[in-house]
């Protein structure tokens, strides 16, 4: 299957690998791995939970689940299965100027074993089913900035 009309490379993946490899010969590159997708709109789901509460008992249960980050989670194994080909492609890129950032490590298999969280006790990390909220984006940006700092530190 040919994804490139000029025939320069046989597939989109091969084209990506070759171009990133070529660019990385003289430039540092940070590869950002896939961000977990939730599969449903987190904010809408949160609102549904709140609207369906029967006070006061459900409020305590809701608050407890929210505090433990367990209210809305996704299966880490499904994330791994869905992103396997992306990981394989990015992992195939080698070179001294290639660096990696793994946003899923912020959300998956950390707070809750085998699950990817969508919130903590104070923040919601998604604005819909797969786009990070300002807080989620800041967390990912902080990971990227840490990687940039490591790269700069190595350069001195």
Regions inferred by a protein language model and the residue ranges of each:
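Extracellular glycan-modifying ectodomains
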Residues: 1-156
């Amino acid at each position: 299957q040919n994804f490139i009309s000029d025939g320069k490379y046989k597939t989109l993946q091969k084209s990506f690998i070759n171009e990133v490899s070529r660019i990385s010969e003289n430039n540092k590159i940070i590869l950002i791995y896939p961000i977990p997708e939730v599969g449903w709109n987190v904010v809408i789901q949160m609102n549904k939970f709140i609207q369906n509460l029967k006070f006061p008992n459900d409020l305590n249960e809701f608050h407890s689940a929210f505090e433990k980050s367990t209210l809305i989670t996704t299966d880490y194994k499904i994330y791994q299965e869905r992103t396997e080909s992306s990981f394989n492609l990015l992992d195939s890129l080698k070179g001294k100027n290639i660096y990696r950032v793994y946003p899923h490590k912020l959300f998956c298999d950390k707070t809750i074993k085998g699950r990817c969280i969508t919130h903590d006790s104070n923040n919601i990390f998604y604005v819909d089913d797969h786009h990070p909220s300002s807080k989620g984006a800041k967390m990912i940006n902080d990971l990227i900035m840490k990687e940039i700092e490591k790269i700069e530190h190595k350069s001195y």
